[in-house]
Structure formats: C-alpha cells, structure tokens
Amino acid sequence: MYITPEPCWAWMYHHDEDKLALELGEDWLFLSPFSARHLIPDSLHGAAFSAQHADYYNDVLDRLRKQLPNSAPEVVQIALNLTAAHFFSLPMMPKSWFFQTSAHIAYACNGKLVELDTGSERARFAVVDGGEQSSLLMLLEQSLALGNKKTMKQFELIKVMNDRLSPCQSLKHRRIVAA
C-alpha cells in the first residue's frame, strides 16, 4: 500500500539515531539515512511536511512506481528518501571523475532511474534533483565501489555531470533491495 501525505506529517531530527526523520503519525516514524553532516542546518530544527514536499513526494512516487518492480513499502521508502534529500541535503560539487561518459545520455528528471558506469561496475541511481548540466543522484544498489578504496552505500548521494547518465536497462526484472 502506498501512503499519501497527511497534514500531521512533520520533519524532525532524531538525535538518538543521528538521522533526519519524518513523523507520519502518533506511533509511526520514518528514519532517513541522512545524518547531520549531510544536511542543511534548518533540518535540525524540524519543519512541517509542506505542500511543496507533498508535491515532490507524489511526483517521484508516481515515477518510481512505473519504473520499479519493488513492493509498495520499498518504493515509498525510496520516494521519502528522495524527498528528504531534495529539500534538506547540503549542496554538492560534481564528482563525475568516478564515472565513464555515457554513449546514450539519459535526460535527468526528478525520480527517474539512471545508471552510472565506473568502468568496472554499473549501478542504478534515482535522480534527486535534475539540472541542466549536472544532477544530484541517490544510489539504489546496496553498495558501489568507486575506486581509491571509496565505496558508496545504499541511499548515499552524489552529484555528477549529466553526460555520465545512462538509461536504465531491464528495470522490471531487477528489484532494489531496500534496507
């Protein structure tokens, strides 16, 4: 079942878990993977889940549902993480050098799935914030080795130039294993 935004939803910073969280009701809390060092300072003081947040969430949820074979709770988790990242992540500079230039460039729009190629491995990402030149992306795979002993974990963010984005291949057969 897909959940729809409610007026009671509110962002808060969960200090015990060191994560941005979304209160979904009295006894229901969604923990994002984002800690304070990746978030803008305003996110640490809480905020309402605004109409702008709801619009973004609904848009990416609809786009993800059409692209992923995952269960509703897994797709909701990805959509909520995209929403948190879109509104509360710190600005980043592109780190395109980790990835090969794509022969078939994918257009970047929020919630779209794309692939990046490190030269030794391909991985799926969701577009958090698609720009004209570069885009902020969220890793959907469990992990991705970038080289120089650097590894990305699921739901980590990276910004890259759009010439690195490739269309995803055979999405309906490959589920994302969400943590």
From Swiss-Prot:
Location(s) in or outside the cell: Cytoplasm
One Pfam family it belongs to: ZapC_N
Keywords, ordered alphabetically: Cell cycle, Cell division, Cytoplasm, Septation
Cell cycle in keyword set: yes
Signal peptide: none
InterPro entries: ZapC, ZapC_C, ZapC_N
An example Gene Ontology biological process: FtsZ-dependent cytokinesis
Chief place of localization: cytoplasm
GO CC terms, sorted: cytoplasm
UniProt family annotation: Belongs to the ZapC family.
Function as written in the Swiss-Prot or TrEMBL entry: Contributes to the efficiency of the cell division process by stabilizing the polymeric form of the cell division protein FtsZ. Acts by promoting interactions between FtsZ protofilaments and suppressing the GTPase activity of FtsZ.
Subunit comment: Interacts directly with FtsZ.
Protein name per Swiss-Prot or TrEMBL: Cell division protein ZapC
Species for this entry: Ferrimonas balearica (strain DSM 9799 / CCM 4581 / KCTC 23876 / PAT)
